[in-house]
Amino acid sequence: MKFLDQAKVYIRSGGGGAGCVSFRREKFVEYGGPDGGDGGRGGDVWIEAVEGLNTLIDFRYQQHFKAARGGHGMGKQRTGARGEDAVLKVPVGTQIYEEDQETMIADLTEVGQRVLLAPGGNGGWGNLRFKSSINQAPRRSNPGEEGEERWIWLRLKLIADAGLVGLPNAGKSTFLSVATAANPKIADYPFTTLHPGLGVVDLGTSTRFVLADIPGLIEGAAEGAGLGHRFLGHVERCKVLLHLIDCTQDDPAGAYRTIRSELEAYDADFADRPEIVALNKIDALTPELVKEQLKQLKKVYKGKPLLISGVTGAGVKDALYAIAQHLGFNNDDIPLPKPSNADEEDPDTDQPWSPV
């Protein structure tokens, strides 16, 4: 299924039904009087967060949603039928904006959450309502009230426990494919991942969490460069970030600074968001070169970076357990592996990871 995280749709609620002009006609009743019923109320337009959806792709094929008009009033004081509602079903995590793309209408963060987008129009009055002491036989009724119409924007922000961030070609998709059962596109060129991906990490017992692969960010992402705003929006809901840095590039410290600057420029709250930093692709360098890259990274990152390889699996489990601990899982029943020591003189890059 293709991933779509933004869509513009047109909505219109149903207009109210017209009131009826009718008079009572019955044998031996010469002056029956008015008995026209009111029109029915038009249908509303709702939006609802449902389970089982993780993309807005359905709105690529249907952009117009219209509720039904209310039924017209009838004689014998019969009110018209109410118009059927229109319900837009979206994934959890969808935000609704006005057409200006700045004014937020609602943020759907829970399954079953519903928001009224456009109420239906009221039904018109039948002539019975216009009867008075000076007008016993009114021939007047009201048309139904027109429904509301508007354009809105839908934006999906994935709800994941942890997010993978980094520059393009940092190995995020490879890590996701090794850590979960997800099958993202993997290739040896930048911007392979064009849409966010999700996978479920299962560490045994009840330790499970959702991991999101965020497409590569570039300098200026906070200002919208390279679809930066759309990608950063998915990071916004993650409780912890795993920052992958390609150790084969010339400046790992610069790569770290670039991503951190863009995150904090987009939202100051990212400064306090838990972060795990890992040097990836250590299988591509000798232990001596890995040590040198680690030294460069520590000039800007004061913590202890992990050493991992998505290809061989080295250090992957360490990173996953570090994420689980930040998420507050109880790991008492899980045999934790010995953490990788980034301060060792000769980091071991030759031992492949095994899930056993």
From Swiss-Prot:
Superkingdom field: Bacteria
Compartment(s) where it occurs, according to its Swiss-Prot or TrEMBL record: Cytoplasm
Gene Ontology molecular function: GTP binding; GTPase activity; magnesium ion binding
Residues the record lists as binding GTP: 166-173, 191-195, 213-216, 280-283, 309-311
Main localization of the protein described in the UniProt heading: cytoplasm
Residue ranges of domain Obg in the record: 1-159
InterPro entries attached to this UniProt entry: G_OBG, GTP-bd, GTP-bd_Obg/CgtA, GTP1-OBG_CS, GTP1_OBG_dom, GTP1_OBG_dom_sf, OBG_GTPase, P-loop_NTPase
Coiled-coil ranges per UniProt: none
Every OBG-type G domain range: 160-328
GO CC annotations, alphabetized: cytoplasm
Keywords for the protein's UniProt record, in alphabetical order: Cytoplasm, GTP-binding, Hydrolase, Magnesium, Metal-binding, Nucleotide-binding
EC number of the protein: 3.6.5.-
Region (Disordered) location: 333-356
Residues given in the record as Mg(2+) binding sites: 173, 193
Required co-factors: Mg(2+)
Family label: Belongs to the TRAFAC class OBG-HflX-like GTPase superfamily. OBG GTPase family.
Assembly: Monomer.
PANTHER family linked to this entry: DEVELOPMENTALLY REGULATED GTP-BINDING PROTEIN-RELATED, MITOCHONDRIAL RIBOSOME-ASSOCIATED GTPASE 2
Function description: An essential GTPase which binds GTP, GDP and possibly (p)ppGpp with moderate affinity, with high nucleotide exchange rates and a fairly low GTP hydrolysis rate. Plays a role in control of the cell cycle, stress response, ribosome biogenesis and in those bacteria that undergo differentiation, in morphogenesis control.
Name of the featured protein: GTPase Obg
Native organism: Hyphomonas neptunium (strain ATCC 15444)
